[in-house]
From Swiss-Prot:
Cofactor binding note of this UniProt entry: Binds 2 Zn(2+) ions per monomer.
Zinc finger region(s), CR-type: 136-214
Binding site for Zn(2+) 2: 166, 169, 188, 191
Descriptive protein name: Chaperone protein DnaJ
């Protein structure tokens, strides 16, 4: 089945900005996250799909390759975009050996050598709250991975057993045959690609040198991270084959939606409703911040929508530097569900304002303008 276009997966058109990509991912990740759709295979697959698209389109090198070649850029032998659980560590290995087969000696005279494959990169998602994202936190996680066998220490052999170079492939792990100008390449059937023959395979790992294990890790998440950010833990991925280095663990951060605040980059936004008497008379209200309540005094004559900017009460970048702002939208709330007595009081108050434009300057100015407009039409 053909893979969907990454831009289409995120509901974007080709050429979308990085900001649009992040916004689309944040919205879709929140909707399809497995924690919110437990037991739904469809949501799990959708989450994997949008995360893969996000990983490629926010990496400038991968995005450039995808824009030019499409999914073909990441197929076997290509650059590799990685998957949901393991990203793969194979790369471009094998070209030097093919040229060595054809022209004898290769580039640098390395000859055939045992295949060494770096361990797979792994991925782990940690969903955190906005408070944790802004202030930083530590999370303990448990991952399941391939680790070096404790019994044979990665050799794949029982103690005292001989480990010899495979005589069939001479340690390369591959069998290549030349037919004219064409070269065929396949995994060695004798050693199954390891490049070695073990007299007595280790009973714990059955000769692989690696075993499946659960591993506990403590992850430090820096202050200022946002949805889609990744942390790379070097050498915490799967163990490599034949003593090769382990892969890396990529911790991907989704941030939960907050009940009060919305985030855009380094700035936080919230909406604060106030009663109309406070807007008319002035007074003090409590503004929410991530550090607690902050009391602010309001002057008289607040209009229905006002903005109050609290400098430095936003988010600090993970790279350091200044903090963003908290931008509060102060909205005057119209009272509802009034009693007859309350309605009568409001009508009495309204009557007391009749003919006094100084109390309603915008109202008077607007209708004066309307009157002049129609007067001019009649001339």
């Amino acid at each position: 089945m053909a893979k969907k276009d990454y831009y289409e997966v995120l509901g974007l058109s080709k050429g979308a900005s990085e900001k649009d990509i992040k916004r689309a991912y944040k919205r879709l990740a929140a909707k399809h996250h497995p924690d919110k759709n437990q037991g739904s295979k469809e949501s799990e697959e959708k989450f994997k799909e949008i995360t893969e698209a996000y990983d490629v389109l926010t990496d400038s090198e991968k995005k450039a390759m995808y824009d030019q070649y499409g999914h073909a850029a990441f197929e076997q032998g290509g650059a590799g975009a990685g998957g949901f659980g393991g990203f793969g560590g194979g790369g471009f290995g094998g070209f030097e050996d093919i040229f060595s087969e054809m022209f004898g000696g290769g580039f640098g005279g390395g000859g055939r050598r045992q295949r060494v494959v770096r361990g797979d990169d792994l991925r782990y998602d940690i969903e955190i709250t906005l408070e944790e994202a802004v202030k930083g936190c530590k999370k303990d996680i448990r991952i399941h991975t391939l680790a070096e066998c404790d019994t044979c220490h990665g050799t794949g052999a029982e103690a005292g057993s001989k480990v010899e170079t495979c005589s069939h492939c001479h340690g390369s792990g591959r069998i290549r045959r030349q037919q004219g100008f064409f070269v065929t390449d396949a995994v060695c059937p004798s050693c199954h690609g390891t490049g070695k023959r073990i007299e007595k395979p280790c009973r714990s790992c059955h000769g692989d040198g690696r075993v499946h294990k659960a591993k506990n890790l403590s992850v430090t998440i820096p202050a200022g991270v946002d949805t889609g950010n990744q942390l790379r833990l070097s050498r915490e991925g799967a163990a490599g084959e034949n003593g090769a280095p382990a892969g890396d663990l990529y911790v991907v951060i989704p941030v939960k939606e907050h009940d009060i605040f919305e985030r855009d980059g380094s700035n936080l936004y919230c909406e604060v409703p106030i009663i109309f008497t406070l807007a008319a008379l002035g007074g003090e209200i409590e503004m929410p911040t991530l550090d607690g309540q902050l009391k602010l005094k309001f002057r008289q004559k607040l209009q229905p929508v006002n903005y109050s900017v609290l400098r430095g009460k936003g988010v600090t970048s993970p790279r350091g530097g200044y903090a963003g702002d908290l931008i509060c939208k102060v909205v005057v709330e119209t009272p509802v569900n009034l009693t007859e007595e309350q309605k009568a009081l409001l009508r009495q108050f309204e009557e007391s304002l009749e003919g006094q434009g100084k109390h309603r300057p915008k109202h008077e100015g607007f209708f004066d303008g309307v009157k002049k407009f129609f007067d001019n039409l009649g001339k």
